[in-house]
Every structure is written in C-alpha cells, then in structure tokens.
C-alpha cells in the first residue's frame, strides 16, 4: 500500500537534505502536476518561458524577499548546479584576475568552498578549525582579514561537524559572502550585512534542484567587470 499523504503513513526523514516538505506543499504540487494554475498544462509540461510559469518564479521571489527581508536593490536568483557550484562561481565572478578572498574554515563545506575558490584566485584561511577537529567557530578578534581582500567567505552552519555561527562574523570591513544552505530561513540572517548569500534549496527551502542566490549592487558591479 502507498503511504498516506495525510501523515499517518509518511516516513520522517532525519537526513540533512532533501528536507521533508509540509503536507500542504506536497498537496499543492500534486494538484499542479496535471494542471498548473488552470492553464491546461501540467507543471512538468509548461514552457519555462511562459507567463504561467513566470508567475511561479515571481511568487517564489516575492516570498523570499518577504521572509528574508531582502533589500529592494538586491537581486534574487534561482540557479542550477547546487550550492557546491557557487564555491567557484562566486570566486569566478567576484575575484577577477588579481582578486583575493579570505575564508573562515569551520567544517567540511567551507573546506570544499576554499578549495574550489583557489582554482580561480588568491585565497587564504583567515581562520581554520581543522586542527582541533572543527569543534568551534571563531570569535570576532580570533583572526585578521587581509587589507586587500575582496571579500570574506564563511559557512553559517556546517552540518558535517555541527559548527554554527551565532553571531555575524567580523569581515574587517570587507564584503561578506555566506553559504547559508542548512540554516537559511531557520535562524535570523541580516541580508543587508552580506553582499552575496547562497543556499541549496534541499535542506531548508524545498526540493533539490535549485540554488537560491541573493546578490547586492556591489556584487553586481563586480560581475560586470
């Protein structure tokens, strides 16, 4: 017998992702599969360039802006490739030919992030917790950011080791970039204090397959270079 969508037969998933979706969301998706917004097209059949699908994107962006209090001059993007793709895409767009980035390495995901960014430009660990087995995150004052760093990258919550920032990391006045995949919308996040926020959807936002990226006017100007 198939598990009931009413909850009694559903299995709870304690994995870090994909996340369990609310029954209301699952039911709404089920209704949209054969007929999206009374368009006559199913959700998986409708053109991604159509007005009816654009309304889905617009609604998602409006909710992201409202829930996260995204400043009006920031851009909200829904991209492919997962959060891991942003490890090097962020560096590729923000560092340029001679850029530098400093990283706070607090777990496995931030290790992966600095490794990928190192393929693009000059990166260094301003703080690295690997020597102690990643049992903590740094306090402000435990590290020094290079004067010529273009930005500072950190991972808000490393699920592999359970190291989570409960404060806004000091960036030495440099733009902040954060991988917020595993706690976005779960804890307060001041978007205006960051110039690029990215998060894979499957842990806190929804099903896998899309990455949320929020970028500031400064980041847009760097990408333009």
What is each of the regions a protein language model found here?
Residues 1-10:
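Basic/polar N-terminal segments that are highly enriched at the extreme N-terminus
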Residues 6-7, 59, 72, 196-199:
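Generic hydrophobic-segment detector
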Residues 10-61:
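A glycine-/small-polar-enriched, mobile loop at the entrance of the PLP active site in fold-type I
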Residues 15, 19, 23, 78, ...:
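Conserved PLP-enzyme active-site core in the AAT-like
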Residues 31-38, 62, 66-70, 119-122, ...:
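Generic secondary-structure signature for well-ordered alpha-helical cores
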Residues 40-86, 93, 107-108, 116:
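Conserved N-terminal alpha-helix of the aminotransferase class I/II PLP-enzyme fold
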């Amino acid at each position: 017998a198939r598990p009931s969508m009413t909850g009694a037969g559903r299995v709870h998933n304690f994995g870090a992702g994909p996340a369990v979706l609310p029954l209301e969301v699952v039911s709404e998706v089920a209704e949209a599969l054969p007929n999206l917004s009374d368009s006559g097209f199913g959700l998986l059949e409708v053109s991604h360039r159509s007005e009816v699908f654009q309304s889905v994107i617009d609604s998602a962006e409006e909710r992201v802006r409202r829930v996260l209090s995204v400043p009006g001059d920031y851009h909200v993007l829904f991209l492919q490739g997962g959060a891991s793709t942003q490890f090097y895409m962020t560096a590729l767009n923000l560092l340029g030919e001679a850029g530098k980035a400093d990283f706070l390495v607090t777990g496995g995901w931030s290790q992966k992030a600095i490794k990928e960014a190192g393929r693009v430009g000059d990166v260094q660990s301003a703080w690295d917790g690997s020597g102690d087995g990643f049992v903590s995150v740094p306090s402000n004052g435990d590290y020094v950011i290079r004067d010529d760093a273009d930005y500072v990258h950190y991972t808000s919550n490393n699920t592999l080791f359970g190291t989570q920032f409960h404060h806004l990391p000091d960036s030495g006045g440099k733009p902040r970039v954060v991988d917020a995949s595993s706690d976005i919308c779960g804890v307060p996040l001041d978007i205006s204090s960051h110039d690029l926020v990215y998060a894979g959807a499957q842990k806190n936002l929804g099903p896998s397959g899309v990455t949320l990226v929020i970028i500031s006017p400064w980041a847009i100007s760097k990408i333009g270079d």
